Amino acid sequence: MALKAEDSFDIYSQLIQSFCRYAENTTVSESQSPAFNAQKEFQTCQDHACCTHSEAHTHILMQQWQLLEEQWEYIDHLKTDVAALKQLLHGFMNSLSGTDSGMEGTNHFLPPHQNPTLLKDEEIVASALNRPSVDINGFEENITTGAQIHAAFTKSPKKMPATSTPRKSEVLWSCSPTLATDGYFMLPDIILNPLDGKKLVSMLRSSNYEPHRFAELLFQHHVPHSLFQLWANKVNFDGSRGKLGLPRNLMIDILHQTSKRFVLGPKEKRKIKTRLNLLLRTRQDRAWWDVGL
C-alpha cells in the first residue's frame, strides 16, 4: 500500500526527533558517568599543576635575582674597603720613605725639623756636644779590638838617657787616639754589639723610658766590663778636662738609637752626657754591670 508524501515526511520527522533525544540522553549519561568525571578531574589537576610549576619557577627566579643584588652590594662595600686600605698603605709607605707628609702623620716622637736618620754622623755628634758641626770625613776610621784598646792604656816612656827622668808630657800611648779638629783626643772606634728587637724592648723597659738611662744601658751593652775598667777615670764623654773622649762610632750609635725613640732637646742631651761621665768616673763591679743589663 503506497504511503502519501505527507505521511512519509511525518515519519521522518519523528525519527529525527527520536534520534536527537537519544543523542541528548546519551551525552547527559556520559557526563554523569564516573569515567567522564575522572577524566575531567585529571584535566583540572594537570592545569593546576602547570600553574603551580610556573609559580614555583617564578619564585626561584626572584630569589636568585635578590641574591645577585645582595652580592653586588657586598662587592661595592669591598671596593670601598680596598680603596681605604690603599690610602692607608700609601700613607704608611710615605712615612717609611721619610717624606714630610708621612712624618707629620705618623711620627710622634721626633720633631719635624730634626730627623736623626737624615743627619750626618758629624752633625749628630756636634749636636749632642753643642759644638759647631765639623767635617770629620778626612779622619781615618780605626776599628780596633779589645786587646788594642788595652794596649792603648799601657803607658811606656820614651827611650831617654839613664840619667834623665821621663816627664809626664813625654809619656806616650802605644796606640795613638784620634785627634779631632776641636783639639780633643778620642779613642779609636770599637766593634759594637748587635742590638735585636727583644733586647731593645728589654732595655726600654729597664730604662723606665728615660733617655739618659736608655743611653747608659746602650753604653753597657756595647762596652765589655773589662774594657770599661780600663776606661774608668781616664775617659769621659767628649774628651774634655784632659781625658780621652769616647770612640766616635760608640757616641754616634748611642745618640742615634736614643734619638730614634725619644725627643732629645738640650736638657736631655746634657743629662746623657752627665750620666755617662758619672759612670766613667769610678770602676764598677762585674755583678753591678751585669745587673744593669
Swiss-Prot record:
Q: Which InterPro entries match?
A: BEN_domain (IPR018379)
Q: Give start and end of each BEN domain.
A: 187-287
List localization entries.
Cytoplasm; Nucleus
* GO cellular component term, pick one: P granule
- Please give the PROSITE patterns that the UniProt record associates with this protein: BEN
Tissue localization of expression: An mRNA and protein component of germ plasm and primordial germ cells (PGCs) throughout oogenesis and early development, being first localized to the granulo-fibrillar material (GFM) of the mitochondrial cloud in stage I and II oocytes and to the periphery of mature germinal granules both in oocytes and in embryos. Shows some somatic expression including the ectodermal cells of tailbud embryos. In adults, only expressed in ovaries.
Gene Ontology MF terms: DNA binding
Q: Name one GO biological process term.
A: pole plasm assembly
Q: How does it assemble?
A: Interacts with poc1b.
What function is annotated for this protein?
Probably plays a role in germ plasm formation, positioning and maintenance.
The protein depicted here goes by the name Protein Pat
Q: Which organism is it from?
A: Xenopus laevis
This chain is encoded by the gene named pat
